[in-house]
Amino acid sequence: METVAKLRETPHWSYSAMQCFITCPLKYKFRYIDNAEVERTGSCFPFGRAFHAALSERARIGIDMSEREVCDVFEDFFKVECEAAQNLTYKQNEDYDTLLQTGFRMLEAACENWMDDYAVQRVAESFSVNVPGLSKPLIGEFDCVVTDGKDTCIVDWKTSSAKWAVGKADKDLQATAFCYAFKAKHGEKPLFRFDVITKAKSPTVNNHYTLRTDDELNRFVSLANQIEKSINSGNFYPNETGFSCGECPYADRCKKWR
């Protein structure tokens, strides 16, 4: 299977694109249709990519990789990602050095609570599957696939400013889309687990398990088709009540929209 970077070179759907349209149709237009220039890049994006890179290496190498080595990977990737980011912006009371130390604490917590040393099947597994009715394949990448008891489980690593509410994972579109893709690719329904690490002075690690029924997977197909139909109809409008407006990379362009 080609890497997800290679898969992105051809027309495709992704969970991120679908979620973007649901969250704010106008943002979807700016990003995926207009290819508008990014006005600002929130620090959470290079931070998240570097954090994922570090945990991916930990999953690949296994128990022989020390916490210090995991943190070194994070530091290297974070530096590169920050240098490449367009108009990088930090939140109040936040800068490169404070985020670096936050990342170290979070990774130490993640390593101390690591539970998959002898269960990892695949790391950064890309996928490209067809969804009935869609004009393009659905692509993406599973962070990690493990054996969880008798079940196969997709693991997705998340950084978060706060602990997740109970039940959040059961409604998450990413888990639905990824479970659909896994079943389409491998012929079995997996469990799904979000490992949520909080950005805090004393980070916490919480595991949120969820699964999807056949009915929920069929509902995803209907949702995906409605999203594509809406986009093809040109239904783009701002959602100014969205939680992500504060860090939107197209905020200035949005203000000029009529």
Sequence positions of predicted segments:
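RecB-family 4Fe-4S metal-dependent nuclease core
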Residues: 1-258
